[in-house]
């Protein structure tokens, strides 16, 4: 897209209606008012105006010559027939005329005693006119990107096209990277759930997103550092094992070896193992949902994890000049036990909660029950700073004005999949092709493409 076009895409002066959920587009749609005046213009000018208005909404990202090849002058429609009417009549009454005696005779032949003739019965299903003009852009509804936008999996037709091009869409179980693919009745298309959550969810604040990215990078760096330290420790253990094997194979007892160094290395290794177990236990406490820690305890637990990591680094030094003593390990163990909640304390807390629930009145119990049900329903929708959209997830602003699904699509929002049931058709009084324009505008647009179809 050209940079110049970005400023005119949602022009508040010309007010073009676009296939997006943008707030400026909603403003243009709400303030559009009545249709532009076409009286006083030539027929060519009327058709040109209608074409420019409708093409801004229907397939505006598709080239004009490509749409001209897709255009079809056949407008699909169906007629609702009344079963009672079809069972009573066979259609001959529609062709009955004066020869059958069903029409009234001329006024000069009537007499005073003559009764009025029987009137021809019309089909009740044809009382409402069928808007054939609204089906002008029906061929575009078969496109994969337009179907994704109609199924509410994307906030605009261009975003739906981007999903297809980036390989986030499958048709009948196979990846489809062509946004212009024409769906057939019965085709199943599915979009990646994360892409749909990002496209239809509320955007995250830029400051929060930057902070989340910084925290994620820091966490990845810490994990990489821990993996490197574990790898170094394993390499040291392997070297010590090889040295011991070589010494045992030699079988030479030239001198009595001083075992103080080996004892020191063994003690350092034992303390390192204790520290690693402490670190695992601290991580278990932080990640376990059964340990309900307050904010201050969480801060203390983070500081403790940093101290344990620092002690591990000191214990892993080969020279052994600075090694943690047993007192450090004991102090860290005692501090960790203070932070953790023992099972007996957890049982006591549960019993206290039960006693408190007995003391609550009926209204408070109902409120508490609703809160618990809400938490159970939104258990999976938790705060996740790593996501690029707002968490807990909520729909995009101003989405309700565009939240409708055509009848020719069967959508399952849980798995972000939809079935293209059939081609859209026009019925008496309604059209299955969504359009913000009146039949008059669509009729003029149809006449514009009629000589080119």
From Swiss-Prot:
Family: Belongs to the universal ribosomal protein uS4 family.
Protein name per the record: Small ribosomal subunit protein uS4m
Compartment list: Mitochondrion
Species for this entry: Neurospora crassa (strain ATCC 24698 / 74-OR23-1A / CBS 708.71 / DSM 1257 / FGSC 987)
Function as written in the Swiss-Prot or TrEMBL entry: Component of the mitochondrial ribosome (mitoribosome), a dedicated translation machinery responsible for the synthesis of mitochondrial genome-encoded proteins, including at least some of the essential transmembrane subunits of the mitochondrial respiratory chain. The mitoribosomes are attached to the mitochondrial inner membrane and translation products are cotranslationally integrated into the membrane.
Self-association state and partner proteins as the record states: Component of the mitochondrial small ribosomal subunit (mt-SSU). Mature N.crassa 74S mitochondrial ribosomes consist of a small (37S) and a large (54S) subunit. The 37S small subunit contains a 16S ribosomal RNA (16S mt-rRNA) and 32 different proteins. The 54S large subunit contains a 23S rRNA (23S mt-rRNA) and 42 different proteins. uS3m, uS4m and uS5m form the narrow entry site of the mRNA channel.
GO molecular function: rRNA binding; structural constituent of ribosome
PANTHER family associated with the record: 30S 40S RIBOSOMAL PROTEIN, SMALL RIBOSOMAL SUBUNIT PROTEIN US4M
Stretch list, region Disordered: 94-115, 221-259
Gene: NAM9
GO cellular component: mitochondrial small ribosomal subunit
Main localization of the protein described in the UniProt heading: mitochondrion
